Amino acid sequence: MSAPPIAAVVIGRNEGERLIRCLRSLQGQVQQLVYVDSGSSDGSAAAARDLGATVVNLDLSQRFTAARARNAGLAVLENGIEFVQFVDGDCEVDPDWIATAADFMQAHPKAAVACGRRRERFPEVSVYNRLCDAEWDTPVGEAKACGGDALMRVVAVYTAGGYREGLIAGEEPELCLRLRRAGWQIWRLEAEMTLHDAQILRFGQWWNRSRRAGHAFAEGAALHGAGVERHWVAETRRALLWGAALPVAIALAALAHPLLMLASLIYPAQVLRLSRRMGFERALFSVLGKFAEAAGALEFYWHRWRGSARGILEYK
């Protein structure tokens, strides 16, 4: 089986040495290397050109989203490119990944997306980095969605209409949902894919990342929640229940009788319940994260009610 033409689209802003490491890891693995820059001030665009990448400078007069950046990279792919590897600029691609994923895709013509194991480069640096590493350890086999790093079949992405550019987060699961509706498959392979440098060292960074997830849940449910997949409906409801409705109900009950404040013990009880399945650390932050997710979901509803759109929610 002959090797298919493959490109890579890398997106980033001010990633510095991480971007250089990312682009170098792709050299020799792809026939076309594209870097989409969203307003870097650290010389990222020039460094990418020096490494042989086609550089696209995103028009920042329009609202920025990662989805817009990925579509901009798609738009400059050369004719004949069969697969495209999407990568975030803070990731390093495993030297065997693209060949492994491309072989799988060629052997499975209904596969539109293949992703592998994304690992955190420095999980020992912070609890938040460890949480990211655990989050990316998803089951092997046919899947519902991928993350930001994945090899995709170009014709499938084009016919699906590309990424939904208005989404500030959750753009990959939304695209995967449309691909699956069109009869395509999403696969998680048992193979090393990328090393990611999350650099989440402070609670505030983790909180904003969780807020962004809650916003994505609510927006995804608003877009596709009525479908048979019930896209992110359960995730949104859990966030709003544990992060908003229950705290308000407990506070109001405590106004009637202070002893009813004991109902708040449901939270440590939930941590202990989840600890049996995921360990104490992950369970604790899973419960804490519901407050941040609820904040993000409520923020989405607030902006939708006002007829406005929220800008990107960054955590680095």
Report each predicted region and the residues it spans.
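Glycine-rich, basic loop-to-helix element that forms the pyrophosphate-binding segment
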Residues: 60-79, 144
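Catalytic donor/gating beta->alpha subdomain of glycosyltransferases that bind UDP-sugars
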Residues: 164-167, 173-229
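Membrane-embedded multi-pass helical conduit in multi-pass membrane proteins
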Residues: 241-307
